[in-house]
């Protein structure tokens, strides 16, 4: 048995189930998980399927807002041509799975990861099974997980259930997930709301993320300190571009190694001590905001 074809439905967003949990989403404690949005898993949907189109658009907005807020973003991705012994019981239900062809393995372009995002190689329904996702979340000081992607009643639900059992609060975004059909989508939301997580809409997620989007008040003034430290080290137009695009690379904008040391020294004087090697691997505003957020926490 393989994946079905011709999936085409409207997401069941009217009368969403009331979540038993009353947790409030906190951007300072949250991470985003983009679940299984590889081309192999979205090919079964018809072109323009409303549920998938909505899920991709909502996921794209959430990912952009998360990066701007310094919230970690994780992606799950399966490997192609899995050994049958490693694929295990999944092969009995879904066949051999994807090949190594990028037409199968690539994450769809609308929500493609940036260099600052993390990829989790997935092995089973749950994103936690045989992965280091839990360790990565703990290392980042995150105990809330915003989940988007496919398929709602399979991997999304399995991940939400295991997150709950690991004391991680799952927030499943009703309009940022898709499924094999409306009934499976609805049942997934009902199960999650009833026993393991909060069912939430993308607009509410965006509101929570944007309240921590790196503004002066939300970031404890670190944007101003970063800007002050870079003043005189970058051309004014490059400095403007750096803050306009939080994923832009400082070195591509004109910062050299000597000036980078001066920049890090200035931040250290303000209480943010950063490793030069780590900084050179991710010289972006989003990375700096995440480090500043961990100091503030």
Language-model regions: role of each:
Residues 1-31, 64, 68, 95-218:
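Active-site-adjacent betaalpha module
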Residues 25-62, 74:
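Short, contiguous, helix-prone interaction/anchoring segments in small proteins
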Residues 37, 78, 175:
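Active-site loop/turn elements of alpha/beta-hydrolase fold enzymes
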Residues 53, 157, 261:
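Conserved catalytic core of two-component sensor histidine kinases
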Residues 66-85:
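Von Willebrand factor
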Residues 73, 170, 274:
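Hydrophobic anchor at the start of a short beta-strand
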Residues 82-100:
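Acidic/polar short surface loop at catalytic or gating sites that assists cofactor/ion binding
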Residues 217-297:
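Phosphopantetheine-dependent thiolation modules in NRPS/PKS and related acyl-activating systems
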